Amino acid sequence: MALKIRLARAGSKKRPYYHVVVADVRAPRDGRFIETVGSWNPVLPKDAERVKLDAERIQHWIAQGAQPTDRVLRFLDQAGIAKRPSRNNPTKGEPGKKAQERLALAKQAEEEAAAKAAEAASE
C-alpha cells in the first residue's frame, strides 16, 4: 500500500483549513485516511499557530515509506523534519529568443558607440 503525507481540505467555503494526513494514494483527497499528523490554517498570519505538525509521528510514517507531497515537504523543511531539495532550472529564467536577439543588437550598438567615442578621444 503506497502512502502519502498530504493535505485534506476542511473548513467552509472561502475559509480553508487543512489537515495534514497520512493516506493511501488511491483514497480521495478529503476521504479515507490513516492518521492525522498535523494541520495548516492558511487564513492565520504567518506565525507558529499557522502550521502544527506532530514531528514524531511524521518521522515514523516517513520511516514506514510514506512520501510527503511538495506542499507538505515545504512545511517539513521549515520545521526541520525533512529536507526539501532545491530545484534548479537555470534556463527557465532566461529571456526568449527574440529578446536575446534584441539584447545582442543593443550590446553590439553600444560597443560600436564606445569604439567611436574612443576613436574620437584619441584624435
Curated annotation (Swiss-Prot):
GO annotations of cellular component type: cytoplasm; small ribosomal subunit
An example Gene Ontology biological process: translation
Source superkingdom: Bacteria
Keyword Acyltransferase in annotation: no
Residue ranges of coiled coil: none
GO molecular function, one term: structural constituent of ribosome
Family: Belongs to the bacterial ribosomal protein bS16 family.
HAMAP family: Ribosomal_bS16 (MF_00385)
Protein name per the record: Small ribosomal subunit protein bS16
Gene name as annotated: rpsP
